[in-house]
Amino acid sequence: MNTSSGWSRQPPASLSELEIHWLFAPGSLTERLSALGEYSLEPVDQRHAAACAADASLLGVEPDSPIWVREVVMRLDAQPCVTARSIASAHALETQWKPLTGYGSLPLGHILYDDPAIVRAPFECALLMPDDPLDAISRRYARAAAPPRARRSAFVRNGATLVVSECFLPQFWSGFAQARLAGA
């Protein structure tokens, strides 16, 4: 995956052990969050758009190609804790990722971890930059002095790529991550 804009498979030296734990935790984030409190997922936006240069690079398409974008906020005990942005090429959505078209408020994990044809790439993490598309949605739910911590991973099904990026908001770090680390 493209490592521009600060994204890397290696955690920045400034991250704490707790942050590294959550940014590189394997498996379903939905399951991990559900163990910490009352979990809910709220769709923020789902649309077709023209791929910006960064999205095009991640998906292996030309800039301005049609892509599908889904943005959600995940809440614990009614507090926004994680924002997520998923992207796929329009062609991939029409073929290999067709089940995602009407997914609404269901977590993507329900299909990503039950299909043996889906292969997950290693995580990348970043301190989000203001020009990152995930930063825009994250700033709607939290203002932070420090850059938000985020992770992303590509899921590939029969050659079609879906990229899921997740930003852990300050409310997550202060209210849930450390207090319940042992159970996660």
Curated annotation (Swiss-Prot):
Binding site residues for substrate: R70, L108, E166
Tree of life domain: Bacteria
Function according to Swiss-Prot or TrEMBL: Removes the pyruvyl group from chorismate, with concomitant aromatization of the ring, to provide 4-hydroxybenzoate (4HB) for the ubiquinone pathway.
GO cellular component: cytosol
Catalytic activity: chorismate = 4-hydroxybenzoate + pyruvate
PANTHER family in UniProt: CHORISMATE PYRUVATE-LYASE
Subcellular location as annotated: Cytoplasm
Alphabetical list of InterPro entries matching this protein: Chorismate--pyruvate_lyase, Chorismate_lyase_/UTRA_dom_sf
Keywords from the UniProt entry: Cytoplasm, Lyase, Pyruvate, Ubiquinone biosynthesis
UniProt xrefs under SUPFAM superfamilies: Chorismate lyase-like
Main EC class the enzyme belongs to: lyase
Name under which the protein is recorded: Probable chorismate pyruvate-lyase 1
This protein's pathway: Cofactor biosynthesis; ubiquinone biosynthesis
One BP term from GO: pyruvate biosynthetic process
The family this protein is said to belong to: Belongs to the UbiC family.
Transport listed as a keyword: no
Source species: Burkholderia pseudomallei (strain 1710b)
EC assignment: 4.1.3.40
One GO molecular-function entry: chorismate lyase activity
